[in-house]
């Protein structure tokens, strides 16, 4: 093993805006220890609702990541983790789910502080994370191979075997939920993990690591290494000891991840990338029921969801009526502000860079000639808050229609026929999510079959369940998170053929 010397990183006591206090780990979590980075460097973590520094956490170096990979590799090859009765892994995952659930108030509050989303939304994210762990616990001993009858004097069967060391890179929009999406199935199938949280939202990943140790996850099985993508991410994608890599983030970075993973050792990879999803509203839609779905589709999590329904297409028969109702609903029902205030639907944008990007796109939309129905401005003097923004009378050549904004900004256009609406929806190079609003089940199912997207929501939107697979087509990536499908992504198939 590499001869490196690490100092213990001490936790810091944090008092959250709702009065809860806790000990926040600040070090790299490697081999069940919280350590300072090899070079001792740290970086500040910001509360996006106030722009104040919460604490400093260690920033991993390439040497730190290599050490984490060595520890994970040892845990996989030199311990019984991968070969033990899978029910034992299920038992530990169940304990981890119980521990997370027992601390749901605290973990939700950490998420709201670190990410800027509302406390209610954060609690929903933690609930999904808990469900992912429970699903993984149940699946641990139930994802198996099969026998194959060839009728020729042979016995044939397959086994599903763990891949090995898995690199996992998650974004800042759903820190705890994305962590569970990736770690839970990997562990259930007998793999070991090195997870890189987004640099701007590392707090819950590090706190989760402390829970892993508490419930008895063996050393080296889970490692958390915060730091910049150019250092930590590059080390994971380029190291040949990483056999599987799961990445959620932008399409641009995802393409680089695919190239590096291929050139290093043809890693098995899952990519969940960007989106510019369409939300179709047909003439027969119930407008009262549709409005909350449109809001959840684009303004949930301040629009920072890769599957956000950021292009709304409304059939011409109800276009004017829906625009008026949408404007009234947003201006009277949707409040923006302090994530810990229960009255607010939308919290802060997670970081300054993304805030500036969104405001720039709003300026671009104005210059392109799109009309603003409502919103378009910053909220308050402190924190990264943007009012929900709706552009209408847009055309398909506008940048605000074609490019992912990743914020509370939506475009609205009209269509005449079902076929025209589907054509407009499918015109994007992305294909992550899509939505349909209609009172006709036959219309919904017909259009769902025609849409080029990994997920189609009918009369709902951005409505996730850990038992349902999620992923994209086209430039939104490949592979699936959640559902039974994700467990197969963390195994290799071995065929055995015996001559009788």
From Swiss-Prot:
The activity is stimulated two- to fourfold by divalent cations but is unaffected by K(+) ions. The active site is at 272 (proton acceptor), 306 (nucleophile). One of its GO terms (molecular function) is acetaldehyde dehydrogenase (NADP+) activity. The record marks 173 as: Transition state stabilizer. Its EC number is 1.2.1.-, 1.2.1.4. NAD(+) binds at residues 249-254. It is found in: Cytoplasm. GO terms for cellular component: cytosol; mitochondrion. There is a cross-link at residues 3, 142, 196 (Glycyl lysine isopeptide (Lys-Gly) (interchain with G-Cter in ubiquitin)). It holds the Pfam family Aldedh. Keywords: Cytoplasm, Isopeptide bond, Magnesium, NADP, Oxidoreductase, Ubl conjugation. It catalyses: acetaldehyde + NADP(+) + H2O = acetate + NADPH + 2 H(+); propanal + NADP(+) + H2O = propanoate + NADPH + 2 H(+); propanal + NAD(+) + H2O = propanoate + NADH + 2 H(+). Its main location: cytoplasm. The keyword Manganese does not apply. Belongs to the aldehyde dehydrogenase family. This is Magnesium-activated aldehyde dehydrogenase, cytosolic. The lineage of its organism: Eukaryota, Fungi, Dikarya, Ascomycota, Saccharomycotina.
């Amino acid at each position: 093993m590499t001869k490196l010397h690490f100092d213990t990183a001490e936790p810091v006591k944090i008092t959250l805006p709702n009065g809860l206090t806790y000990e926040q780990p600040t070090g790299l979590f490697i081999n069940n220890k919280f350590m300072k980075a090899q070079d001792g460097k740290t970086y500040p973590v910001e509360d996006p609702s106030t722009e104040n520094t919460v604490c400093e956490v260690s920033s991993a170096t390439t040497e730190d990541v290599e050490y984490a990979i060595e520890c994970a590799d040892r845990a996989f090859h030199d311990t019984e983790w991968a070969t033990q009765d899978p029910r034992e892994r299920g038992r530990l995952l169940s304990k981890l789910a119980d521990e997370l659930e027992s601390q749901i108030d605290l973990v939700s509050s950490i998420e709201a502080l670190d990410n800027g989303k509302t406390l209610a939304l954060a609690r929903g994210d933690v609930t999904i994370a808990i469900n992912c762990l429970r699903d993984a616990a149940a699946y641990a001993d139930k994802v198996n191979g099969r026998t194959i009858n060839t009728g020729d004097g042979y016995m044939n069967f397959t086994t599903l075997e763990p891949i090995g060391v898995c690199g996992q890179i998650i974004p800042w929009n759903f820190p705890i939920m994305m962590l569970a999406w990736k770690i839970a199935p990997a562990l259930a199938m007998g793999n070991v993990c090195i997870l890189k949280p987004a640099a701007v939202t590392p707090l819950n990943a590090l706190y989760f690591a402390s829970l892993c140790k508490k419930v008895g996850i063996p050393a080296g099985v889970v490692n958390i290494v915060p730091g910049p993508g150019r250092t930590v991410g590059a080390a994971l994608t380029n190291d040949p000891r990483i056999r599987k890599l799961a990445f959620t983030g932008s399409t641009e970075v995802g393409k680089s991840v695919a190239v590096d993973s291929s050139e290093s050792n043809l890693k098995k990879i899952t990519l969940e990338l960007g989106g510019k999803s369409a939300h179709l509203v047909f003439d027969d839609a119930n407008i009262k029921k549709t409005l909350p779905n449109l809001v959840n589709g684009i303004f949930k999590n301040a629009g920072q969801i890769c599957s956000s329904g950021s292009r709304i297409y409304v059939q011409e028969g109800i276009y004017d009526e829906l625009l008026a109702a949408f404007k009234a609903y947003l201006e009277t029902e949707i409040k923006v502000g302090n994530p810990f205030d229960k009255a607010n639907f939308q919290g802060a944008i997670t970081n300054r860079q993304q805030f500036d990007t969104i405001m720039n796109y709003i300026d671009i939309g104005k210059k392109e000639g799109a009309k603003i129905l409502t919103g378009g401005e910053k909220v308050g003097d402190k924190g990264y808050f943007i009012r929900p923004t709706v552009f209408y009378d847009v055309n398909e050549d506008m940048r605000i229609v074609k490019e992912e904004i990743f914020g509370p900004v939506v475009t609205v256009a009209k269509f005449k026929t079902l076929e025209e609406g589907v054509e407009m929806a499918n015109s994007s190079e992305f294909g992550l999510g899509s939505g349909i609003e209609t009172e006709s089940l036959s219309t919904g199912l017909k259009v769902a079959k025609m849409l080029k997207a990994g997920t189609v929501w009918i009369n709902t939107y951005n409505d996730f369940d850990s038992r349902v697979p999620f992923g994209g087509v086209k430039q939104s990536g490949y592979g699936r998170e959640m559902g039974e499908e994700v467990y197969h992504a963390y195994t290799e198939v071995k065929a055995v053929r015996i001559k009788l």
